């Protein structure tokens, strides 16, 4: 059955899935099972604990077909919730034959505890708990996400869904007072409603303060901007700063001292980096001015700064920046960006967010180590929600082995550098998936499950016992396939970002108006970024640390062919999982197959566009018309194959409306965009016909 655009939201918000219970699962030795003789109880005075009790009651009713009353009095056969100073951190789950006690260190931790109990029962597919006393302390202070259903969209269902998925902090894009990139947004309403569930809120800052810290009256100017902000939003937990969104008139001679859009001299590009993309010698003072302004009006609001934009810089330069960095500003560091990679001896570094990198990059490790030495608190930009720019409009990269390895490296980072805060996803949002499960289960202090057993239980829970082995094999093939992924700028801002809807532009310019060949990709007019982060005229975006594209592409195509082979093997297992899935879990198995199918077709598109570019360039460099026609034949053959790939994608996006959508771009690969792509290729083929005629004009 087809979905309409945005129908996925209803599934996303279904944090208590109905009818999870397996009637054959009973309590074994060392376990208890809740029955209708039990009650759920809590003492008055803790509002989030009360919400947790009622939420757990709803869970049992909806997911376990068990209806239990709420009581205010503790007693036998009662699951009792309480908050006590006797617990320093987290909560204690004490399970006895006739009583369950949950003692939380603070009110909001009661909700975390009942969600953990739900997780345990979901894995068993029954209201069963092991007997014993279990202490659970969160390893991380915050796990932040953006909304999974729309930019800065946080209805009650979204807040509850993200909390059940293991996240506890939300991010809002701040352009001005009650303004984000979409227009008006009542920030205080979001902050207050989130706080009701114990969820913190932070601002992702886009407010411009084009002020040099040494200019006259600088601090007063910062105070005016950020003071007004903090007065209006006294309950905001933190403000996150980032270089590319916070350029300033640096006086560092190594930079242009201007915004990147103005870095020209008499029309000649100034090739020095712009402030915001370079650790300017005066940047620490600039950050300090913002910190002073924020803390003058609210010392409890945290300030963080991301060095995302200059992780490419040499360590000595970054160390100099850290030497002067304000100690009371948190430093945010990206896990994988700028990771060094070689492919058949060529340099192919990671250029942007990707799940293909499960090892921390040199920038991440060196920045964490040097900051920790200097007493600077570090936070990680980590993408543990399982989405990145790998395939820009999907809910999850279904590669649990890669995600788990990343999670385990972050446990080590917590121990080495006290990295206690995670920015789990950028504006591409999150999905309640195996990635969310792994994030929760790897996030406990001094406790880890058997991860292989956990993944099998997750597969059984979501797809059924007979389907689970095939799901595990699909996950393994796809995890291995991600080892052959290409994380270049032209791919992640091109075919990876919008999938098979990516246009194939014939590169010769046949025009009487000398028009640019770049196409403005069609996106919703209200989209946060929309077409601005989609580059449609495919060509290499070169980098000083990267082998040039004409050398890379043959090697990258070979790598992607390996990825395609592994992805098809995983897809075959996903098809078998659909056949074997339990009836009530079959739709979930179909969605896994659809996700794998969409990604497979995105890989094909990326291979095709690299072949397309090479053929276009070779055609234009030909020395004879006959040679050029051979490449033109190849171009038309690639176009025909891509048309079939696009047509094959349409049923997939019709089945799952989350495929082809991303919060900051809105829909970019739904049925409409895929049919647009078919029209665009028709247009390109009219150009190839014209060019073929032009090649033979001299023969007439």
Regions found by a protein language model. Give the residues of each.
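Acidic, contiguous N-terminal accessory segments
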Residues: 1-108, 123-133
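Substrate-binding groove of N-acetylhexosamine-processing glycoside hydrolases
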Residues: 2-22, 26-28, 50, 73, ...
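Extracellular/periplasmic catalytic domains that process cell-envelope and extracellular macromolecules
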Residues: 33, 94, 138-139, 232-233, ...
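Structural motif
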Residues: 41-46, 81-85, 103-105, 147-151, ...
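Solvent-exposed, polar/charged alpha-helical surfaces in well-ordered, non-transmembrane soluble domains
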Residues: 54, 58, 62, 115, ...
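Short active-site loop/helix that positions an aromatic residue
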Residues: 108-121
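Glycine-rich, aromatic-flanked loop segments that form ligand/cofactor-binding clefts
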Residues: 128, 135-147, 152-177, 182, ...
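Substrate-binding cleft of carbohydrate-active enzyme catalytic domains
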Residues: 144-305, 316-323, 330-332, 338, ...
């Amino acid at each position: 059955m087809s979905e309409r655009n945005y129908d996925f939201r209803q599934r996303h918000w279904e944090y208590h899935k109905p009818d999870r219970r397996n009637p054959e699962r009973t309590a074994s030795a060392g376990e208890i099972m809740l029955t209708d003789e039990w009650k759920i109880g809590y003492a008055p005075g803790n509002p989030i604990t009360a919400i947790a009790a009622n939420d757990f009651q709803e869970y049992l009713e909806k997911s376990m077909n068990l209806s239990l009353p709420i009581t205010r009095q503790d007693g036998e056969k009662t699951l009792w919730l309480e908050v006590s100073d006797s617990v320093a951190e987290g909560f204690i789950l004490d399970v006895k034959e006739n009583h369950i006690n949950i003692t939380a260190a603070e009110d909001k931790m009661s909700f975390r505890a009942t969600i953990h109990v739900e997780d345990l029962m979901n894995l068993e597919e029954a209201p069963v708990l092991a007997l014993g006393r279990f202490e659970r302390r969160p390893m991380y202070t915050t796990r932040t996400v953006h909304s999974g259903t729309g930019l800065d969209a946080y209805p009650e269902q979204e807040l509850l869904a993200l909390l059940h998925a293991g996240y506890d902090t939300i991010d809002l894009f701040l352009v001005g007072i009650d303004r984000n990139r979409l227009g008006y947004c009542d920030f205080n309403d979001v902050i207050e409603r989130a706080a009701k569930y114990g969820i913190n809120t932070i601002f992702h800052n886009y407010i411009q303060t084009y002020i040099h810290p040494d200019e006259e009256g600088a601090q007063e100017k910062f105070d005016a901007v950020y003071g007004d902000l903090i007065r209006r939003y006294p309950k905001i937990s933190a403000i996150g700063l980032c270089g590319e969104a916070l350029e300033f008139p640096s006086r560092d001679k190594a930079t242009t001292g201007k915004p990147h859009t103005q870095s020209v001299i008499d029309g000649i590009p100034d090739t020095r980096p712009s402030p915001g993309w370079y650790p300017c010698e005066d940047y620490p003072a600039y950050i300090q001015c913002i910190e002073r302004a924020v803390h003058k009006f609210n010392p409890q609001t945290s300030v963080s700064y991301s060095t995302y934009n200059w992780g490419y810089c040499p360590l000595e330069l970054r160390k100099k920046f850290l030497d002067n960095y304000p100690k009371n500003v948190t430093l945010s560091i990206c896990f994988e960006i700028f990771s060094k990679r070689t492919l058949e001896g060529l340099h192919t570094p990671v250029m942007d967010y990707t799940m293909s990198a499960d090892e921390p990059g040199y920038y991440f490790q060196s920045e964490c180590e040097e900051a920790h030495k200097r007493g600077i608190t570090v936070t990680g930009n980590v993408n543990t929600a399982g989405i990145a720019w790998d395939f820009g409009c999907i809910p999850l990269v279904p590669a649990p082995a890669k995600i788990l390895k990343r999670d385990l490296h972050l446990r080590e980072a917590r121990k080495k550098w006290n990295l206690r805060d995670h920015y789990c996803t950028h504006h591409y949002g999150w999905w309640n998936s195996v990635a969310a499960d792994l994030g929760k289960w790897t996030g406990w202090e001094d406790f880890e499950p058997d991860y292989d057993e956990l993944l099998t239980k997750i597969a059984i829970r979501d797809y059924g016992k007979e389907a689970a082995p095939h799901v595990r094999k699909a996950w393994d093939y796809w995890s291995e396939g991600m080892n052959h992924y290409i994380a270049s700028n032209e791919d992640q801002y091109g075919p990876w970002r919008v999938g098979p809807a990516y246009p194939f532009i014939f590169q010769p310019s046949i025009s009487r108006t000398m028009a640019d060949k770049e196409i403005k990709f069609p996106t919703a007019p209200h989209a946060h970024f929309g077409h601005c982060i989609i580059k449609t005229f495919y060509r290499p975006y070169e980098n000083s640390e990267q082998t040039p594209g004409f050398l890379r592409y043959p090697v990258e195509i070979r790598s992607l062919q390996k990825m395609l082979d592994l992805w098809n093997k995983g897809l075959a297992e996903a098809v078998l999982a659909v056949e074997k899935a339990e009836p009530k879990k079959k739709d979930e198995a179909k969605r896994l197959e659809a996700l794998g199918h969409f990604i497979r077709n995105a890989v094909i598109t990326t291979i095709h566009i690299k072949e397309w570019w090479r053929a276009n360039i070779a055609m234009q460099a030909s020395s004879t018309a006959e040679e050029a026609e051979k490449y033109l034949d190849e171009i038309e053959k690639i176009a025909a194959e891509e048309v079939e790939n696009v047509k094959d994608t349409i049923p997939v996006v019709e089945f799952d409306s989350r495929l082809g959508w991303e919060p900051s771009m809105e829909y970019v690969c739904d049925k409409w965009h895929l049919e647009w792509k078919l029209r665009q290729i028709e247009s390109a083929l009219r150009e190839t016909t014209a060019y073929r005629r032009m090649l033979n004009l001299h023969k007439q």
